[in-house]
């Protein structure tokens, strides 16, 4: 074998080695799935997209998280179940759904539990929120961040509901939430369970006298045109959780986990700021459109709170401890 032929063979072997290893500069790309309800335009889903984009950038394209919206991968309950077993890698879901795996989470979503959004944020961002989120780990889920889902209030067609007396016998539409189906009768009203896409028709046909929702949904869904009386009772402040399958989580290096946690926190902060801005815009639009935006006086607010106390009495000891910790962080003014 002459010298030139040996050089050709050596060069060919070197090329084959590079082809097999993919070179040292090309990252090994791994793909993951993220499931979420609502449309891609929903603010929490915009935050999910930002989260996926940031993770891709921060890992130089090595980790590619592909989001699916509109419950494409299943309902919240189904997506969480798949996430537990590693069938779906990440899920954004309401706390109420995740509470099926960690009952302490339900203690963060009780009626009239928070005095303001700042109170909620102190809880979610502090030790209480992190400890409660950590309770998911025993069930195969790793909590990453909380997304703010706004406060919910009552809106009605005929008059403002600024007292329990005004609530009596009203038919109020609500989603299939066991808590709201409990709360509304405690106000003296009737709970009418409806999917979100039937609320507007039910208002038009007088099947219901009102409903409860967030301000952005009140405006974006056109409810403000059908039920122009909005009462700031703020019966609940809501949050979603972004979780990862613990099975998937354990495949990431420590550095990758740190990157993912940082991106989740940044996405949550972005979403919170934009949701609060959306609430202000919705309030201005509704009021300028002629809606009556009513406040509860302190006497009536206390009556509303007292009416739902039986819900607190039926909590487990662990949930009551969470509630006490939440109350300790309430606004002082």
Sequence positions of predicted segments:
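Signature of the catalytic double-stranded beta-helix
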Residues: 122-134
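N-terminal secretory/targeting leader peptides
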Residues: 20-118, 128, 137-333
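Bacterial N-terminal signal peptides that target proteins for export
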Residues: 1-9
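Bacterial N-terminal signal peptides
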Residues: 8-19
């Amino acid at each position: 074998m002459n010298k030139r032929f040996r050089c050709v063979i050596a060069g060919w072997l070197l090329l084959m080695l590079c082809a097999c290893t993919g070179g040292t500069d090309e990252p090994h790309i791994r793909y993951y799935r993220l499931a979420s309800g609502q449309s891609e335009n929903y603010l929490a889903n915009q935050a999910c997209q930002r989260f996926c984009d940031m993770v891709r950038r921060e890992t130089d394209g090595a980790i590619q998280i592909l989001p699916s919206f509109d419950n494409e991968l299943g309902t919240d309950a189904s997506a969480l179940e798949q996430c537990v077993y590693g069938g779906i890698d990440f899920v954004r879901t309401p706390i109420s759904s995740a509470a099926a795996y960690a009952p302490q989470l339900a203690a963060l979503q009780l009626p009239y539990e928070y005095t303001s959004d700042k109170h909620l944020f102190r809880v979610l961002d502090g030790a209480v929120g992190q400890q409660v989120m950590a309770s998911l780990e025993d069930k195969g889920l790793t909590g990453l961040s909380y997304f703010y889902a706004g406060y919910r209030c009552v809106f009605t067609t005929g008059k403002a509901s600024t007292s329990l007396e005004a609530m009596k016998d009203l038919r109020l539409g609500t989603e299939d939430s066991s808590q709201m189906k409990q709360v509304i009768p405690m106000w003296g009203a009737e709970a009418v369970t409806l999917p979100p896409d039937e609320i507007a028709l039910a208002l038009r046909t007088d099947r219901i006298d009102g409903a409860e929702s967030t301000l952005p949904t009140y405006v974006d869904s056109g409810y403000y045109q059908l039920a122009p009386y909005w009462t700031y009772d703020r019966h609940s402040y809501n949050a979603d959780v972004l979780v990862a399958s613990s099975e998937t989580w354990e495949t990431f290096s420590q550095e990758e986990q740190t990157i993912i946690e940082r991106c989740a926190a940044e996405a949550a902060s972005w979403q919170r700021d934009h949701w609060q801005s959306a609430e202000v815009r919705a309030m201005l639009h509704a009021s300028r459109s002629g809606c009556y935006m009513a406040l509860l006086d302190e006497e009536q607010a206390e009556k509303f709170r007292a009416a739902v106390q039986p819900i607190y009495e039926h909590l487990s000891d662990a949930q009551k401890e969470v509630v006490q910790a939440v109350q300790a962080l309430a606004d002082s003014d």
